[in-house]
Amino acid sequence: MDTQAFRRSLHHSDRYNRRGFDSPTKRAQALEEAYQSDLISSIRDNGFTYTKGRLNIKLAQAFGFCWGVERAVAMAYETRRHYPNENIWITNEIIHNPSVNDHLRKMNVKFISAKNGIKDFSLVSNGDVVILPAFGATVQEMKLLHEKGCHIIDTTCPWVSKVWHTVEKHKKHVFTSIIHGKFKHEETLATSSFAGKYLVVLDLEEANYVSEYILGKGNRNEFMNKFSKAFSNGFDPDKDLDRVGVANQTTMLKSETEEIGKVFERTMLKKFGPENLNSHFLAFNTICDATEERQDAMFSLVDEDLDILVVIGGFNSSNTTHLQEIAITKNISSFHIDTPERISVKENSIFHKPLGSELELKKNFLPSGKINVGITSGASTPDKVVADVIEKLIDIAS
């Protein structure tokens, strides 16, 4: 499929909307009423610090809702107001935040069900309204919904769309897209659907493994087994890794994405020489500004004198998970929670998710005496949720 041609035709359809329905001013007011917090605003104005009794709170200087998330959430709410009686569907979670998704369910927005990773669109009918989430949707899903006669409300973050343009450029010039991401993540599934040949690498370790293979030091069967769910149909590592371009899932760790780009640039330089580098490697710049800002702020926060650190965001949120990883590199006692309800004031306990593990209960997690607590949140977490967490910490400390 010519994905660029399809997207152009879709954008000209009278059943497609990527601008929403309200003015920017009205949209900002609605979000402020729903999700902003006077407490958080006050802490921002006070240099991102807040002291109450023995508790000293230090907020990251960039956290919470990014503008892409704000736009997606606002457009989803506007859609229900604009279509008060129609069937409204959404192809996935609008963002990785349980409270926001629960609110959409209360507005009678239906979530497309999936079994074994395959979505069931059989109940979606002609004239229904379908919201595409901030992560985007695969080009095959868009085509199916358009052919069904649905009204498509596209809340895809423009930074994600930028990555789609990048992999389409790779395809046009017959380069294989090396996508730094999680192959099951909604955003990476969408991005890979716009690519030609592609290979998804999770981290620097996998990138180095691929690099070694390109330089003739790997085993084909082992390679194919290792990446069996992470490459395009018909992918041949002996042919399709001679010309590569790098792209990324926008919520991945910025520093790792940059290093992966350098790995493949050095690999192609070594294999083909400097005079042929541009014929075998395409440079990239698909790192999201908001992701970069939040990760940079987290690196600054973990350099503070902290006793514990609380990271707030959906457990399936990639950008939140990477914030947790940064805390771990500094050996700070950190706790990843998705809602304030994970904290029990009465028990001084927290039900949290250690990186790569199942949920576990930590009792007496807030130490006695004066305590410095660092707090940050993922790009899908509203300020009100952060404020509710702080209020619980204050109640425990008092």
From Swiss-Prot:
InterPro entries: LytB/IspH
Keyword field: 4Fe-4S, Iron, Iron-sulfur, Isoprene biosynthesis, Metal-binding, Oxidoreductase
Pfam families: LYTB (PF02401)
GO biological process terms, semicolon-separated: dimethylallyl diphosphate biosynthetic process; isopentenyl diphosphate biosynthetic process, methylerythritol 4-phosphate pathway; terpenoid biosynthetic process
Binding site for [4Fe-4S] cluster: 66, 157, 288
Annotated signal peptide: none
Keyword Oxidoreductase: yes
Gene Ontology MF term list: 4 iron, 4 sulfur cluster binding; 4-hydroxy-3-methylbut-2-enyl diphosphate reductase activity; metal ion binding
Amino acids binding dimethylallyl diphosphate: 96, 185, 317-319, 380
UniProt-annotated binding residues for isopentenyl diphosphate: 96, 185, 317-319, 380
Keyword Iron annotated: yes
Reactions this protein catalyses: isopentenyl diphosphate + 2 oxidized [2Fe-2S]-[ferredoxin] + H2O = (2E)-4-hydroxy-3-methylbut-2-enyl diphosphate + 2 reduced [2Fe-2S]-[ferredoxin] + 2 H(+); dimethylallyl diphosphate + 2 oxidized [2Fe-2S]-[ferredoxin] + H2O = (2E)-4-hydroxy-3-methylbut-2-enyl diphosphate + 2 reduced [2Fe-2S]-[ferredoxin] + 2 H(+)
Enzyme class: oxidoreductase
Active-site residue numbers: 187
CDD domains attached to this UniProt entry: lytB_ispH
Cofactor binding note from Swiss-Prot or TrEMBL: Binds 1 [4Fe-4S] cluster per subunit.
Amino acids binding (2E)-4-hydroxy-3-methylbut-2-enyl diphosphate: 96, 185, 250, 317-319, 380
Named cofactor requirement(s): [4Fe-4S] cluster
Main function: Catalyzes the conversion of 1-hydroxy-2-methyl-2-(E)-butenyl 4-diphosphate (HMBPP) into a mixture of isopentenyl diphosphate (IPP) and dimethylallyl diphosphate (DMAPP). Acts in the terminal step of the DOXP/MEP pathway for isoprenoid precursor biosynthesis.
Entries under PANTHER family matching the protein: 4-HYDROXY-3-METHYLBUT-2-ENYL DIPHOSPHATE REDUCTASE, CHLOROPLASTIC
HAMAP family the UniProt entry points to: IspH
Protein name: 4-hydroxy-3-methylbut-2-enyl diphosphate reductase
Organism: Prochlorococcus marinus (strain AS9601)
Gene from which this protein is expressed: ispH
